[in-house]
Swiss-Prot record:
Main location: cytoplasm
Listed CDD domains: IGPD
Reactions this protein catalyses: D-erythro-1-(imidazol-4-yl)glycerol 3-phosphate = 3-(imidazol-4-yl)-2-oxopropyl phosphate + H2O
Name of the protein in its database record: Imidazoleglycerol-phosphate dehydratase
UniProt source species: Clostridium botulinum (strain Alaska E43 / Type E3)
Length: 195
């Protein structure tokens, strides 16, 4: 079978973002957004989803992290959608509970063709490293809308914001790995015939 790959660039007055992904990879990655903690979370996602990710973002971090984080989510979602192609033979659904020390999170998703996000997580800190915690939801929203997946993210319990965020990204990787996995049916997993 042919690897599912995509290469996209997005240039605005606020950011310049490039991504190259392989959904059938092994989790290789080289990621530079200028926001160290975001890089780390995307590396974890890449590893746990078995998706090769090469991503660079040159954004207006002198203003704040909003544009960079959102635009990375946008291009990531677009690349995922493009790489999936016609969606024949995928499992479609993925759900994963991910423990990270005292934190337990739930990620559930549907590669449905309908972009939607439910995000139920509270943070006590304004930032973890240089990443604004309010931007975690914005990243997942941008990814969900642009990849056209339905995505539910919930932290069930826990205190440490770093652990919460890491649990979400790892769980997202594992759920997406299951959903994008190919099966032997080689048909679109919908009674409608399309997703």
């Amino acid at each position: 079978m042919q690897n599912r790959i995509a290469k996209i660039e997005r240039n605005t007055s606020e950011t310049k973002v490039k991504i190259d992904i392989n959904l059938d990879g092994t989790g290789l990655n080289k990621i530079h957004t200028g926001i160290g903690f975001l890089d780390h979370m995307l590396e974890l996602f890449s590893f746990h989803s078995n998706t090769d990710v090469y991503l660079s973002c040159d954004g207006d971090l002198n203003v704040c992290d909003h544009h960079s984080v959102e635009d990375v989510g946008i291009i990531f979602g677009k690349a995922f959608k493009e790489a999936l192609g016609d969606k024949k033979g995928i499992n479609r659904y993925g759900t994963f509970f991910l423990p990270m020390d005292e934190v337990l999170s739930l990620i559930s998703l549907d590669i449905s063709g309908r972009g939607f996000l439910v995000f139920d997580c509270e943070f006590t800190r304004e930032k973890v490293g240089e990443l604004s915690t309010e931007m975690i939801e914005e990243f997942f929203r941008a990814f969900a809308l642009n990849s056209e997946i339905t995505l539910h993210c919930k932290v069930l319990y826990g205190k440490n914001d770093h652990h919460k965020i890491e649990s979400l990204f790892k769980g997202f990787g594992r759920a997406l790995r299951d959903a994008k996995e190919r099966n032997e049916l080689n048909k679109v997993p919908s009674t409608k015939g399309i997703l």
